[in-house]
Amino acid sequence: MATSRAALCAVAVVCVVLAAACAPARAIHVGTPAAALFEEFKRTYGRAYETLAEEQQRLANFERNLELMREHQARNPHAQFGITKFFDLSEAEFAARYLNGAAYFAAAKRHAAQHYRKARADLSAVPDAVDWREKGAVTPVKDQGACGSCWAFSAVGNIEGQWYLAGHELVSLSEQQLVSCDDMNDGCDGGLMLQAFDWLLQNTNGHLHTEDSYPYVSGNGYVPECSNSSEELVVGAQIDGHVLIGSSEKAMAAWLAKNGPIAIALDASSFMSYKSGVLTACIGKQLNHGVLLVGYDMTGEVPYWVIKNSWGGDWGEQGYVRVVMGVNACLLSEYPVSAHVRESAAPGTSTSSETPAPRPVMVEQVICFDKNCTQGCRKTLIKANECHKNGGGGASMIKCSPQKVTMCTYSNEFCVGGGLCFETPDGKCAPYFLGSIMNTCHYT
C-alpha cells in the first residue's frame, strides 16, 4: 500500500510466554525437502501456476521465505513462525501488495507534527492490562487482500471503536468508501490515516458509510469509481476531529486505556511468516503498514501489545499479532493517531451548527514570469478545499496534503466529476506554463 517515521492487525489477551520451548530455527521443517513443502503449500492454498517458468520462480520465492522464516524464529524465542499464504510471493511482491510504502509514512510524521492537534494522556494510573475486544469496541478481523489499503482499514477500525465508545452501537464501517473516494490518499497504492480523517471532515462532514451499504471489493487490487448513490448508502458513523497521540509507549498505553483503540503505523517486514506468540525482535527500519492497536498486557514475563491486522483471520493469532512493549518494536510508537467522535453525535442527524467546521486552510499562491519565482510575481490568497467559480461556467479547487498542493479545474460550477489537475510541492517553486508558481499551505 501508499510518509515519516511516526504513526500509516481476536482472541482474549492472555499472558502466554512461549519461552525457549519454541522450536529453534534449525528445527522448522527439518528433513523435508523444500519442493515437498511447496507441493503441500499449493494444495493447502489452492495455488496453480500457468507456466513452468512461473512455477520455478514461485518455488524460488518459497525457498527464500523458508530461509527468512528460520531467521525470524532464531531471533524470536517467544513467538512461533511457519508457512503462510504469502510464501510464494517475492519480498518485493509482498511489500507492494500488503505494505503501505515507506515514502508515505516518512513525510507524514513531519507534516503531522506541524499541523495536527496533540492529545494529552494521564500517565499517573495506567492499568496493567487492557483489551478493547473484551469490551465490545472491535469489529471482526477483515482482509485487505492484494491491495495496499492498510491505511483505510487502520483508520476505519479506529473510527469503529471511537463511535462505539461515544455511546453508539458497534457497526462495521466502509473501507471501500475511503479506497474509492478519498482523493487525498491513493487507494490500493497507499495512504495515511490522518489524511483519511481529514478527507472525511472536509468532504463528507465527517460521515462514514456502513460496510453493508458500501462493501469492500478491492481485494484484487482493482479500485472502482467512487459511489455517490444516496439511495443505497447508509451513514454509519461521524467524526468531528482527530488527534496525534504522544509517541511514547507509556503515553500510548494511557491514552488507549482511557479512550480506545489507536490507529498506528509500523514496520511489518517481520509479519509474513508469523503464526503466534510475542515478537521480541521485530524489524524496525521503516514504517510501511497501518494497523489497529487494541490492547496490551504488562502482567507477564514479556509485556506485549495486541494488534489487529487486516490480512484475514487465517493469519497470525486469528488475525492478530502480539509485539513486545517498551522498546519501540517494529517502530510501533512513531505514528499513533485517532479520530474523535462527539458523544452526542448520531449518524445522519448532525447539522453544520452542531459539528465544528474543519480548520480553514489558506493557500498563498505566487505566480511569476520567470522560472525561479522571483520576478514579475503576483500573490493571491485562496481558500483550500472550496469550489471557486471562474465566471465562464467552470470552477476550480485547490487542496493541501503532505508535501504537495493539487490544483484542479472543472468544466462545471460544482467541482464534480473528472477535473484537470496539476500538482506542485508545498512551499517550493515549480515550473508553470511559461513562468513559475509557488503554492504554500497555511493552516489557521
Swiss-Prot record:
Any single biological process term in GO: proteolysis
InterPro entries noted in UniProt: DUF3586 (IPR021981), Papain-like_cys_pep_sf (IPR038765), Pept_asp_AS (IPR025661), Pept_cys_AS (IPR000169), Pept_his_AS (IPR025660), Peptidase_C1A (IPR013128), Peptidase_C1A_C (IPR000668), Peptidase_C1A_papain-like (IPR039417)
Catalytic center residues: 150, 289, 309
Signal peptide: 1-19
Record carries keyword Transferase: no
Prodomain positions: 20-124
Entry-linked Pfam families: DUF3586 (PF12131), Inhibitor_I29 (PF08246), Peptidase_C1 (PF00112)
Entry EC number(s): 3.4.22.-
Molecular-function GO terms, alphabetical: cysteine-type endopeptidase activity
PROSITE patterns the UniProt entry points to: THIOL_PROTEASE_ASN, THIOL_PROTEASE_CYS, THIOL_PROTEASE_HIS
Subcellular location, record wording: Lysosome
Glycosylation, residue list: 228, 372
Disulfides per UniProt: 147-188
GO cellular component: lysosome
Gene3D superfamilies assigned to the protein according to its UniProt record, in alphabetical order: 1.10.287.2250, Cysteine proteinases
CDD domains, sorted: Peptidase_C1A
Tree of life domain: Eukaryota
Main location per the UniProt record: other
Keywords: Disulfide bond, Glycoprotein, Hydrolase, Lysosome, Protease, Signal, Thiol protease, Virulence, Zymogen
Role according to the record: The cysteine proteinases have a potential role in host-parasite interaction and virulence.
Family that this chain belongs to: Belongs to the peptidase C1 family.
Name this protein carries in UniProt: Cysteine proteinase 2
